[in-house]
């Protein structure tokens, strides 16, 4: 009887080991698309008092991005986005797409707009599974950027030094770096102050 119980216990053991390992394996698989990836996040460029587009200064920033990100010189490396992602257009704003349009034309790569502002979890999950680009540039609305950073595993307040993204700030670049396991390396992530237009950094 004792022998029979021992054999049954040994038979159950592999199943227990497999079940305890499954979440880790699934987690690794979910982050595959972010292995050794750099994610760049900007707020859309300046907006006018009315309308869905950019202000004249916003158009200048969008044009400046076409050069700033081709290539972005950061930490002794030249980074060129291989994917451009913007919030989907809405009735009130097409600004994230318009912010990336000059860069898109210069790099000859399309702007992807699969998700709305609040769908940050879906965006991050999609990148974790399917992304093959080593550098991804995302343009989003400022009210949702902290949530986007959090979805990637970061802390927006710690990165920006603010409780929330300020209403009048358009010249911050968020840099998120991921390791060879697809996990965010917060110590290597940063906020960069752009100096593209007069008044930037003041």
Report residues per predicted region.
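Sec/Tat signal peptide C-region and signal peptidase I cleavage site
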Residues: 20-24
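Residues in and immediately flanking transmembrane alpha helices
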Residues: 17-18, 57
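Active-site-proximal alpha-helix that buttresses catalytic centers in soluble enzyme cores
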Residues: 25-133, 144-202
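Bacterial N-terminal signal peptides
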Residues: 9-17
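Alpha-helix initiation/capping motif
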Residues: 2-3, 119, 141
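Bacterial N-terminal signal peptides that target proteins for export
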Residues: 1-10
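Periplasmic-binding protein-like
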Residues: 135-139
């Amino acid at each position: 009887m004792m022998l029979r119980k021992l054999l049954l216990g040994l038979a159950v053991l592999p199943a227990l080991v497999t079940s305890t390992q499954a979440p880790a394996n699934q987690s690794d698989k979910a982050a595959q698309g972010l292995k050794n990836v750099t994610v760049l996040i900007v707020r859309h460029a300046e907006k006018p008092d009315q309308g869905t587009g950019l202000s004249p200064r916003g158009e200048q920033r969008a044009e400046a991005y076409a050069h700033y990100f081709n290539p972005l010189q950061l930490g002794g490396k030249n980074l060129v986005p291989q994917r451009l992602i913007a919030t989907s257009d809405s009735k009130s704003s097409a600004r994230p797409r318009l912010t990336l349009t000059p860069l898109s034309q210069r790099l000859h790569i399309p702007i992807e707009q699969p998700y709305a502002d609040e769908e940050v979890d879906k965006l991050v999950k999609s990148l974790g599974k399917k992304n093959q680009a080593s550098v991804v540039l995302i343009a989003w609305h400022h009210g949702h950027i902290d949530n986007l950073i959090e979805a990637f595993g970061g802390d927006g307040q710690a990165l920006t030094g603010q409780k929330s993204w300020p209403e009048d700030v358009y010249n911050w670049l968020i840099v998120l770096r991921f390791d060879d396991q697809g996990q965010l390396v917060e110590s290597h992530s940063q906020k960069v102050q752009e100096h593209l237009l007069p008044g930037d950094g003041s």
